[in-house]
């Protein structure tokens, strides 16, 4: 089979117009009607021209032909392909060459021919003219220069990549596919086969290059030369280092200390200067004695160092306190900075704000204290009003009963005054008094004959003290107390009740008495009977409200 491009006489990258022009020209030349003297040969050539144009004029047919051109030219895709490329396996032995000369059977001549044949095959499978014009480095001869020939050759061929497409290795003919899905599957399998064959060919060529390079005398000579150069460089570096050490050692031996750097000379000069200053100020004769005295003083004052340090620390604390601004919450390092800060506008604003806050706090505290005192006074007034109301009601009943049950009791002795303990609760614990609300069986003693002569203030005091013992359940307590005292009415004890049991100090108001008990701790515990009586009085006062 002949190549279609060669039949039409065009290049492989020819355009459709070029193909059409070439086809018309050849068709007119080889048409059978115009070649009657050689009709059979003309007809055969005309068939080839027409078949080539039919394939190349169709884009799909042309693409498939370009991919399978080599296979078609060498037997077709049906498996009858005969690969006429060079067999590289036979060149992996040392028996393929004799010696390392440039003769026909020498090392360099044999492998030069091998790589030239590989280059020829690669150019045949190139699609573009640019690929054909690419230069493949030559293997060279036994005397070729390493840098210009040998190094370039091995640099290219050690990374060799073939241009062959290995279309003859395909297993399926995509033209025989019944549908596009089957065609795609065939193309996928054919691509895998081509890639595998291409990879194997590249690896084979690279292995051959490694085999040749290992035995190339030019490479060995260059390697030896490089080793010698490296050894010579290392030797020179070592020699240079040794010379530097010797020169440094020599400089160290020849070094002399300068007079201005000698410490001994400096010490002498210092001593001389001290002696001169001592003579000038009259301290030279006593310098040694002064030193001894100073040492003794230092030893003697060891114990006083701690005290001095403590005093210094206290002074430093005072100093730093003076450098602290509480209004701005800032500390300063010097008196000047503190003074500048105290003159600043921001500092004055902060001081005014702080002063205002302190005044507001003082006002709020004083107001709270005043309100608390007013509340206490109001509570006292309320208690007094309640007691007055209750006493008025009960005194009115007593007066009624006195008119009916008044009997002469002038001969009865007065009941002795008793001091009751002060309770801890807000209610006062008073001595029990006879209740005017008792039944008629209980005799009510008459007042003392001198009662009519008493002033009004005394009478009111007796009425208030009697009214405090009244309540809803106060009658029972009054009965018990009257029986215990033989039915004699107790004397008024209001003034006695505002007295501290512990220190016997009298107070004008209950608030003062309670403040005294809280501050001194003179409060005493009540008995169970007194506590129950006090709670009952509280309940009675609440209900009467």
From Swiss-Prot:
- Zn finger limits (C2H2-type): 323-347, 498-522
Quote the SUPFAM superfamilies the UniProt record gives. beta-beta-alpha zinc fingers, Chaperone J-domain
The chain positions of domain J read 3-69
Q: Which is one Gene Ontology cellular component term of this protein?
A: cytoplasm
Q: Which UniProt keywords apply?
A: Chaperone, Coiled coil, Metal-binding, Repeat, Zinc, Zinc-finger
Where does this protein come from, organism-wise? Danio rerio (Zebrafish)
In this chain, composition skew of type Basic residues spans 339-348, 394-406, 535-545
Q: Which gene encodes it?
A: dnajc21
Q: Where is this region: Disordered?
A: 122-141, 276-302, 331-497, 522-545
Main function:
May act as a co-chaperone for HSP70.
Protein name per its UniProtKB record: DnaJ homolog subfamily C member 21
Provide the GO MF annotations for this entry. nucleic acid binding; zinc ion binding
Compositional bias (Acidic residues) at which positions? 129-141, 283-295, 372-388
> Which ranges of the sequence are coiled-coil?
180-286
Q: Does the keyword Zinc apply?
A: yes
| Record InterPro entries | Chaperone_stress_response, DnaJ_domain, DnaJ_domain_CS, J_dom_sf, Matrin/U1-like-C_Znf_C2H2, Znf_C2H2_jaz, Znf_C2H2_sf, Znf_C2H2_type
């Amino acid at each position: 089979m002949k190549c279609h491009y060669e039949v039409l006489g065009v290049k492989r990258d020819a355009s459709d117009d070029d193909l059409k022009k070439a086809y018309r020209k050849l068709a007119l030349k080889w048409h059978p009607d115009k070649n009657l003297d050689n009709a059979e040969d003309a007809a055969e050539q005309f068939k080839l021209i027409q078949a080539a144009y039919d394939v190349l004029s169709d884009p799909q047919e042309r693409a498939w032909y370009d991919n399978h051109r080599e296979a078609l030219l060498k037997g077709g895709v049906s498996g009858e392909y005969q690969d006429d490329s060079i067999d590289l396996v036979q060149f992996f032995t040392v028996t393929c060459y004799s010696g390392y000369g440039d003769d026909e059977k020498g090392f360099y001549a044999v492998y030069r021919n091998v790589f030239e044949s590989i280059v020829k095959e690669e150019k045949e499978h190139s699609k573009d003219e640019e690929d054909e014009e690419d230069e493949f480095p030559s293997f060279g001869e036994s005397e070729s220069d390493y840098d210009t020939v040998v190094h370039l050759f091995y640099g290219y061929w050690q990374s060799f990549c073939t241009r062959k497409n290995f279309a003859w290795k395909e297993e399926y003919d995509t033209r025989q596919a019944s549908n596009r899905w089957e065609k795609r599957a065939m193309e996928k399998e054919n691509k895998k086969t081509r890639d595998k064959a291409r990879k194997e060919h590249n690896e084979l060529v690279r292995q051959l290059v490694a085999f040749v390079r290992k035995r190339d005398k030019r490479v060995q000579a260059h390697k030896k030369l490089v080793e010698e150069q490296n050894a010579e460089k290392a030797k020179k570096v070592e020699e240079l280092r040794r010379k530097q050490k010797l020169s440094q050692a020599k400089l160290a031996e020849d070094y002399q200390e300068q007079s201005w750097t000698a410490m001994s000379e400096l010490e002498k000069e210092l001593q001389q200067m001290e002696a001169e200053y001592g003579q000038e100020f009259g301290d030279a004769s006593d310098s040694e004695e002064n030193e001894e005295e100073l040492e003794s003083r230092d030893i003697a004052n060891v114990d006083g160092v701690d005290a001095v340090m403590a005093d210094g620390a206290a002074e430093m604390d005072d100093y730093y306190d003076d450098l602290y601004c509480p209004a701005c919450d800032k500390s300063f390092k010097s008196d000047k900075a503190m003074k500048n800060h105290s003159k600043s506008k921001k500092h004055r604003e902060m001081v005014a704000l702080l002063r205002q806050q302190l005044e507001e706090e003082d006002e709020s505290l004083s107001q709270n204290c005043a309100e608390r005192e007013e509340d206490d006074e109001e509570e006292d007034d309320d208690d007094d009003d309640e007691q007055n109301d209750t006493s008025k009601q009960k005194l009115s009943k007593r007066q009624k009963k006195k008119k009916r049950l008044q009997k002469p009791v002038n001969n009865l002795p007065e009941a002795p005054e008793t001091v009751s303990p002060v309770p801890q609760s807000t209610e006062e614990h008073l001595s029990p008094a006879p209740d005017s609300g008792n039944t008629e069986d209980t005799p009510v003693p008459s007042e003392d004959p001198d009662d009519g002569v008493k002033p009004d203030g005394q009478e009111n005091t007796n009425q208030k003290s009697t009214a405090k013992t009244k309540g809803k359940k106060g009658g029972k307590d009054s009965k018990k107390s009257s029986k215990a005292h033989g039915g004699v009415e107790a004397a008024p004890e209001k003034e006695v009740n505002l007295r501290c049991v512990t220190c016997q100090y009298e107070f004008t108001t209950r608030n003062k008495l309670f403040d005294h008990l809280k501050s001194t701790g003179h409060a005493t515990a009540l008995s169970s009977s007194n506590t129950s009586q006090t709670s009952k009085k509280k309940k009675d006062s609440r209900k009467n409200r």
